[in-house]
Amino acid sequence: MSSLFVEGMPLKSANESCLPASVKQRRTGDLRRLNHHRQPAFVRGICRRKLSGVSRIELRTGGLTLPRAVLNPVSPPVTTTKKRVFTFGKGNSEGNKDMKSLLGGKGANLAEMASIGLSVPPGLTISTEACEEYQQNGKKLPPGLWDEILEGLQYVQKEMSASLGDPSKALLLSVRSGAAISMPGMMDTVLNLGLNDEVVDGLAAKSGARFAYDSYRRFLDMFGNVVMGIPHSLFDEKLEQMKAEKGIHLDTDLTAADLKDLAEQYKNVYVEAKGEKFPTDPKKQLELAVNAVFDSWDSPRANKYRSINQITGLKGTAVNIQCMVFGNMGNTSGTGVLFTRNPSTGEKKLYGEFLVNAQGEDVVAGIRTPEDLVTMETCMPEAYRELVENCVILERHYKDMMDIEFTVQENRLWMLQCRTGKRTGKGAVRIAVDMVNEGLIDTRTAIKRVETQHLDQLLHPQFENPSAYKSHVVATGLPASPGAAVGQVVFSAEDAETWHAQGKSAILVRTETSPEDVGGMHAAAGILTARGGMTSHAAVVARGWGKCCVSGCADIRVNDDMKVFTIGDRVIKEGDWLSLNGSTGEVILGKQLLAPPAMSNDLETFMSWADQARRLKVMANADTPNDALTARNNGAQGIGLCRTEHMFFASDERIKAVRKMIMAVTPEQRKAALDLLLPYQRSDFEGIFRAMDGLPVTIRLLDPPLHEFLPEGDLEHIVNELTADTGMSKDEIYSRIEKLSEVNPMLGFRGCRLGISYPELTEMQVRAIFQAAVSMNNQGVTVIPEIMVPLVGTPQELRHQIGVIRGVAANVFAEMGLTLEYKVGTMIEIPRAALIADEIAKEAEFFSFGTNDLTQMTFGYSRDDVGKFLPIYLSQGILQHDPFEVLDQKGVGQLIKMATEKGRAANPNLKVGICGEHGGEPSSVAFFDGVGLDYVSCSPFRVPIARLAAAQVVV
């Protein structure tokens, strides 16, 4: 018999986990009768029903006997939005897992766990719609909501046979936030609500003074910080001062008398900090706590987190009110957090942490560094066995890896929360592949399970040679989020953001992170903390972003004021270089070399499923043979954009030849300079054709304005350098620069306008393309060249350039004795071209939308100057996204849709794609698939992301 606590009342209950399977199976026959004759569902630190075995039947898997939940009837989703409070308790729920938008992720999953018979503390969930009404009502509870909350509270009190504020049979509550999308640590939680001087005395009489006053001082601290806005540090100072006076290091070493005295000191903090006393009325406490959770939805840290993670369209947060269970009732109690599989690697093994004699926030907040879950198996074997069983049940029910919070009170297990677990890219891919192999999910579900950001993480670098830095390892913490990070040390979130804005790589070093640090955590290359476990705030947030993190590094001492941290006698100061290995927890002095990651077998398997599912082809933007090889290795199906101008910067000889061409006055001078460039271009094209053997290569003719090839600096410096490069006199240079100067070069002398004005420029580039194509074909390479004319705004421009291209092609084929098939098309990047796409399509064999310039010209935003006002537009909600990163579907997107439809109407064989960086942005890819484009083209490193995004559109 284990002693359990029912809100101030110690109870005894049998441990059903010890019952023989035959007894449990017989009890299932009583299910219907018991459902009509329910006993109180004692929860969260309260005992289960004596016959709780009825909620399970045995499932034999090989030699292992595992329990399986029997699904009790679940209430269908509520169709009216008028209901704002939903109750739940073991075997009964007014909600379910499909109601996340209304109940939040936490509330929906609590309802679901209760419905399938797991031991969940009874409670109630206030809907996200109520939060929205609260915000619209001037941050006041909307009419009638408080009465609905009290009605829900009556249900909980009846289930518990306890009352809020009754010292003899007190009901204590937790009040937690829970949005539809998980936002770890961003919103607020209050535990042990309902305590005051009278209630704590009653609690002490029944459950022990130390436990009672430990709960009280925790509540005073948390309520003061979350609800009253009192800095946590003011309470922490009192705690640390008392521990110093007593000569102890751990909170658990404080006596009952110490904790009672500490509670009095905490109450004084209210008066000192706020000028008002701690509110003793439990219902007033509850009302204030609900308000605080609703307020936390609109807090700066929550807003920043949603902005960083592009979370939009949510109504607000739900509020979950549950009766408390206690992990701080001694050495037979504890609390923990676990994942049903390793979230970093995906390994099928429980991954979590456990703290004996502690409450849940101690683990999540990183206040104490917890121990491995194995500790629980050793000291609480029965509770651990049931926990393992519950993990199996939940994975089979949700068909996903789950993140679970639990408490053990006097050897009794209570499930406090479950949600889909956040995972790294590596973990996501392995979990998806393993679950397909296990028969839990199909490949289409697996494709939806891996986010495009997960693949982005897998493309991040690792250390080039881990063995080379071993002598520089100065400390080892917990490997909280894998990958490698190299940067300069900073000690505040603000500094991390500042350094990032300056183009510097920063490592954020903190004693422990808090939700206020999210901006700096996002800006930093990596995160190092002295405290906190694998499920601390820093670890969870970093893993969600694929950010390298080492947590709980007990060897370091952080001094924020001095901007240094120490490891023994070694001092590391702000600006020093540091490297982190988030996969091993190693902290390494200096700037270590990084190397790109290699694709794993799991990733190759997963990407093959994505490729089978998608319709849209994925090409790459690549300008060099190395870029082309990288693109092919990442799964590109061709080159959608090869920018010839980038080749000109590859060497001093090339750029000097380009400058001679620009400075040329006569066609003869210009041709002489171009003849110098031709072998360079031909060599580069040969390398690209070789790398893309058998795949199409789309080469764009010269596009940028000529000034981009001139030296930087003041006019005198430019003239001196051009004089040296070209051999012309200064007067000639000055005269030529004056003639070439433009007020707005991005709308001036560039693109096809260059090729029309200087046909010899187009001739040189096309000659280099076809000479390279024939040469490679003669070497056994299958070459599929496509030539793209940029910045076309009229069909006449395209017709002119096609004439030049076909003339040169005929000459080269005649000279080299071989004819190859090729295509000629154009970029659609001027709004006028989109409007008359039907006319242009009569000349072109393919369209490629240049969404960078099309966005620039449609909005009238200069890409070079948009940084001056775009942050203001985004912060004020004038724009929801940077249109150069996320396609403007209502404006630019409609031009693309119209041009595609008109172009294909005029030329049914027209191939249509997109080659701006939008080609690698998932929501943009979904749009391109929807309007029927044939392909997208993006940077080589974003090719896997585009492949997955294209697959997710159709599954």
From Swiss-Prot:
Enzyme Commission number: 2.7.9.1
Transit peptide: 1-71
Modified residues (Phosphothreonine): 535
UniProt GO MF annotations: ATP binding; kinase activity; metal ion binding; pyruvate, phosphate dikinase activity
Compartments it resides in: Plastid, Chloroplast
Binding site for Mg(2+): 829, 853
EC top class, as a word: transferase
Listed pathway(s): Photosynthesis; C4 acid pathway
Temperature-related activity annotation: No loss of activity below 10 degrees Celsius.
Regulation: Activated by light-induced dephosphorylation. Inhibited by dark-induced phosphorylation. Both reactions are catalyzed by PDRP1. Very cold-tolerant.
Necessary cofactors: Mg(2+)
Alphabetically ordered keywords of this record: ATP-binding, Chloroplast, Kinase, Magnesium, Metal-binding, Nucleotide-binding, Phosphoprotein, Photosynthesis, Plastid, Transferase, Transit peptide
Cited InterPro entries: ATP_grasp_subdomain_1, PEP-util_enz_mobile_dom, PEP_util_AS, PEP_util_C, PEP_util_CS, Phosphohistidine_dom_sf, PPDK_AMP/ATP-bd, Pyruvate_phosphate_dikinase
Positions bound to substrate: 643, 700, 829, 850-853
Main location: plastid
Other notes: The reaction takes place in three steps, mediated by a phosphocarrier histidine residue located on the surface of the central domain. The two first partial reactions are catalyzed at an active site located on the N-terminal domain, and the third partial reaction is catalyzed at an active site located on the C-terminal domain. For catalytic turnover, the central domain swivels from the concave surface of the N-terminal domain to that of the C-terminal domain. A short cytoplasmic isoform may be produced by alternative promoter usage.
Family according to the record: Belongs to the PEP-utilizing enzyme family.
Subunit structure: Homotetramer.
Name of this chain's protein: Pyruvate, phosphate dikinase, chloroplastic
This protein's encoding gene: PPDK
